[in-house]
Amino acid sequence: MRCPYCGNEDTQVKDSRPTEDNTAIRRRRFCTACGGRFTTFERVQLRELTIIKTNGRRVPFDRDKLMRSVQIAMRKRPVEQERIERMVSGIVRRLESMGESEIPSAMIGKLVMEGLSSLDAVAYVRFASVYRNFREAKDFEEFLGELSGPLGSSLRDEDEDR
């Protein structure tokens, strides 16, 4: 494994252990050239996935990009990182087990919306605002009006707490 600090290819694994949800192996590594320490994760990849963007362009699936998108929606929300990681791992497993190698980006957005709806109502609305391309305040109002059940009531409860 190449050192991210100096580019040296001679690194040593100092510690390996499974992640808490057993979906990856976490490895602590040490660079023999610069002494840098870094962590890598090894995950099972069932198949190569290609995402079909709304403009028709095809790009390789990037789990890290999915995680970044979810973390942006979850920023400053009281949700443990482990729960976010489990949600993202679940989405990836669902995508890989669909049997398709090409997946529309809208499908990923739908799966993220499903996951966020049970994780955090505010993050759900944040993600929806980007996913559904909200342009004006009325777009938020219409979306919030569509919400019903526990998610809608939890958003209203948070609003009343302020």
Curated annotation (Swiss-Prot):
Chain ranges of the ATP-cone domain: 49-139
GO molecular function terms noted in the UniProt entry: ATP binding; DNA binding; zinc ion binding
GO biological process, one term: negative regulation of DNA-templated transcription
Disulfide-bond pairs as recorded: none
InterPro entries, per database record: ATP-cone_dom, NrdR-like_N, RNR_NrdR-like
Tagged with keyword Cell cycle: no
Zinc finger (unnamed): 3-34
Basic and acidic residues bias locations: 11-21
Pfam families linked: ATP-cone, Zn_ribbon_NrdR
HAMAP family cross-referenced by the UniProt entry: NrdR
Protein name, entry field: Transcriptional repressor NrdR
Record organism: Parvibaculum lavamentivorans (strain DS-1 / DSM 13023 / NCIMB 13966)
